[in-house]
Each structure stands twice: as C-alpha cells, then as structure tokens.
Amino acid sequence: GTQMLHAAGLTMAARYKGLDRIACTFFGDGASNQGTVLESMNLAAVWNLPVIFVVENNGYAESTSIDYAVAVDSYIDRAAGFGIPGVTVDGTDFFAVHEAAGEIIKRAREGGGPAFLECKMVRFFGHFEGDPQRYRGPGELDRIREFRDFSKEVKSGDTVGADIFQIGQFVDA
C-alpha cells in the first residue's frame, strides 16, 4: 500500500514544477486497510491531486474475507468518505474497465482531482504458491468457476471474435 504515497507525492511534485501529470496506483483489497492508503486518499482529496486509486477487489485479503475486514459494502463508499468520487466495475470485463478508466482519467486531466475505481474480480488460485485455500467455503471455487467460465462466454457468443480482435488491437497499440 505504500505506492499510494508515492503517487500523491509525484502528482504534488508535478504540480509544483508546472507539469500536467496524473498518477494511477493499483492495490488489492487487503492493502486498502493500511493506514498509508487512507492517508494518501485524504491527502489527494484535500489537495485535489490527480491520483487515480484502483483497487482490485477479489474478496480476500490473503486469507481473510473482506466480510471480516471492511465495514462498508463497497470500497467506493470508503472513498466517498474522503469526498473522492468512484465507480465499481466488473474487473473481468475489459471493456467496462477501459470505459470507466477513460472517464476517470479524463476527469483527472481536467483538474477534477482524485478518483477511485473498484474492479471486482475473482482470485481462482491461492494468494501464494501452495496455498491450500482452506479459508474458502465448501464448493465456493466450483461455483465461481461455473459462473465465470470464459470459454463458455466465447462459445455462446457473449464474447465474439470481433471483441477478442478489438482487445488484441488495443493491447498492441
């Protein structure tokens, strides 16, 4: 979570030097409970710094469910406590993330200050190599894999070849 302090500091230095810069920082839902994250959000809000905070919310801080670690329903609610606007998207939907990030980046570049993007996603594997994931409930991973089987989406036409080609073109650019 310490990179948030760097992002705030970089945007403050850029402002001091007259440079038109923004910073984007990524962190997991577990890191969001570190004091430096909250301090950085407060600093960015007070000084209207163009910092974009992106939390990758997979529901677990290593092995602790967010139900036991976070008192709000959504991380954007926490950001709102600092006066920072935010949006939650399906972090597995490339186009949703791209669209939301584009709007937030535009806002930051226009002097709108900090913003918060919560990307909800699933962690299919453990937090570390060899993690037995005993903290997950019975059948939890099976239900998730059934619900988020991307090969079924491609086969069913929800994600079509043109979409995959468009993603490839964007990544190559």
Q: Model segments located where?
A:
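Glycine-rich ThDP/TPP pyrophosphate-binding loop and its adjacent helix/strand module
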Residues: 1-173
